Structures are given as structure tokens and as C-alpha cells.
From Swiss-Prot:
InterPro entries, sorted: Ribo_uL30_ferredoxin-like_sf, Ribosomal_uL30_bac-type, Ribosomal_uL30_ferredoxin-like
UniProt-recorded name of the protein: Large ribosomal subunit protein uL30
GO cellular component term, pick one: cytosolic large ribosomal subunit
Organism, scientific name: Aliivibrio salmonicida (strain LFI1238) (Vibrio salmonicida (strain LFI1238))
Molecular function (Gene Ontology), one example: structural constituent of ribosome
Keywords from the named record: Ribonucleoprotein, Ribosomal protein
Amino acid sequence: MSKTIKVTQTKSSIGRLPKHVLCLKGLGLRRINHTVELEDTACVRGMINKVHYMVKIEE
């Protein structure tokens, strides 16, 4: 079983760059305080790095 990480959206996506909003959607985040559990892959890490200022990560 691969490693998973929990990602929580902490800030709103209103007024953000369209690419960053799409990254949040790609991660499965819809609203503030929404948490999803994702596999720890390079693709997921790349999306998290783009929106690091709007999310909180728990390993």
C-alpha cells in the first residue's frame, strides 16, 4: 500500500489565478476546511506545491 497524505484547504479560491483554482479541483478540494486523503505521488506533490499557500498538509 502506498503512502497517503491528508490535504486540507485553509483559504478561499476566490480571486486566485485560474491555474491555482484548477489545481485545487484536481486535488479534490471544494471548500474551506475540506480534507481529502491522496496518494503521495509526484503529480500530487506538484499540485500541492503550486497552491501551498492555500492548503495544509499532514503526512
